[in-house]
Amino acid sequence: PKNLTIFHITGLGAVDKYGLNHLNHSGLVSKVIGGNYGLQIPFMKNLIVGNKIEAYNFPQGILSQMCRTMASKQPGIITKVGLNTYMDPRIEGGKMNKKTKKNLIELIKIGGQEYLFYKAPRPDVAIIRGTSIDNDGYVYMDHEATTREDLSIAQAVHNNGGLVICQFKKFIKKKYTNPHLAKIPSFLIDYYVHDPLQKQTYVTKYDKFRSGERSLKRPKLEKIILDVRKVLARRAALELRRDDVVNLGVGISVGISNIAYEEDIYKDITLTVEAGVIGGIPGSGLNFGTA
């Protein structure tokens, strides 16, 4: 293959030999559409900064919704998200370099009000993963720390006549399994890849607490070192009030979860992260996105 377009929601491949590192070959990638490049591997950043490929940076929430939009064969998403920002085609339209010319976002008017129309791609290959498959090929997420958009991605590619590849860790040998635990039906999947060494996150092999299979009355976390980042996180934590719902992004802000733990106020607030996890103590570093 060559001149591939990569669609990912956030941070696909951050370290070593994982993720997009597999695509580090000359001419293999010509375009990328993503929601986060902060943890992206160097070769992708170099291609973007060097004007070697077309690159778009869209809101993660829009790209997450786009998976369902593509699955239902809708033309795109109409929203006010991004108006008068970097997303607005009157400014930069989410384009990341000079090589990127085509507008994938249009400014439209409905009922006299301005909206942005994010055009839906037509995906033809999906690479997803789960934990287990049963005798019928149904996919289970029993050890996953998050369930992500895997079902919508599989539906989008399948409904577009494409190829769906699913990586999994283990086979379920039981004759009967709880159907409520099956997340992706086998008819959406074309190929399975068995990886018995599949890890839960980049740095965690398997943690039953992150997958929600077990719970602790009080989680055990190491205190983060006292530095400028912690001082900033502590100052932000002073703004928290009982029953607040707090969304934490990757970076300094995720330290607020550690502060909430240290001060024993995490039970009085609800911590969330952009990946969709609600409650608990959000993970930091390469465990970010889990809790």
Regions found by a protein language model. Name each.
Residues 1-291:
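Conserved alpha/beta enzyme-core scaffold
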